[in-house]
Amino acid sequence: AYQNGNKIGYSQTSAMLTGLKKSDDFAFLKAVDSIALQQSLRDLDRGFVNFFQKRAKHPQFKSKHSHHQSYRTINQSNNIRIVGKYIKLPKLGYVKVRQSMEVGKINNVTIEHTPTGKYFAVLNIEFEPQPMNNKGGKVGIDVGIKEFYSDSNGNVVYNPKYLEKSMRKLMREQRKLSRKEKGSKNRNKQRVKVALVHEKITNQRNDFLQNESTKLIRENQTICIEDLKVKNMMRNHKLAQHIGSASWSKFFDMLTYKSVWYGNDIVKVPTMYPSSQTCSCCGFKNPLVKNLAIRKWECPECHTKHDRDTNASINILDKGLQMQSA
């Protein structure tokens, strides 16, 4: 259609869906939540718009055989609500849930089926964040691989490296999976075991990131970070796995949305700013420190001894405060 100059958007696909529902071959569509079907068409339309505007890759076909499935539906006329230990969903009725927190007004819900066989209801809600009485501090953050981050106060948080610690077990379970016959029950059981290892790593990493980001938000009013282009850094194949495992982007995202909730200030220092090479005491720029192998150095100008990451975090704080006051 695109090559022939024809455009198919949400309106056209919605009309096609109506026709399919009337067909005997697709009668099962009537048993599905109609709002969820419309949402999938809107998502498809948005995906192609982003693709043609070069903001995203071509939308991928989602196979019904995939072990990760999800759908989203909108709350209309209170058709989605929490009642005691149950959640009411369109077409499904009341489903028992384990609720992790109190919820406000529900806008929409995404039902996810994970590769480990678990179901999650992810709620999009409206709530009024309560102001957080932080300590009013100001801090600069320099992220790394061995040390997850060093701050301008001299604190160092080490990278827990959950993926690396679980790699041996993950490889063992994956080898067992490769030996199972495709389509067999034993292969499916082993697939779940592999998925459980991945799920544990993800949960550990998310818990760590949530705790560290919340701690920084509680203790500081202003947080200065580098505006890292993580996607470009991932092109370094020697470091890509370690950078991905550290999840810097997700950490920065958490700091950003929590700062919006609680009124903190996040200042992003330009990537090209030489924070590691500049002496935080006298401002002398030492080009030799560009070598990542140098972890400690002495300033030739003022003879101050520096830890590479702590010095960088102090410079990031100073540059961020300078940008904030400009």
Regions found by a protein language model. Name each.
Residues S14-T114:
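Acidic carboxylate diad motif detector
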Residues Y2-N4, F51-K57, Q221, S259-I266:
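Surface-exposed helix-capping loop/turn segments at secondary-structure junctions
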Residues K91, E102-K105, P115-A326:
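Positively charged, helix-rich recognition surfaces that bind polyanionic ligands
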Residues S11, A15-M16, V230:
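N-terminal, Lys/Arg- and Ser/Thr-rich interaction peptides
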Residues S11, I35-Q38, R42, A195, ...:
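An alpha-helix initiation/capping motif
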Residues A1-Q12:
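N-terminal cap/recognition module
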Residues N4-G5, V32-I35, T304:
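A short N-terminal beta->alpha junction/helix N-cap motif
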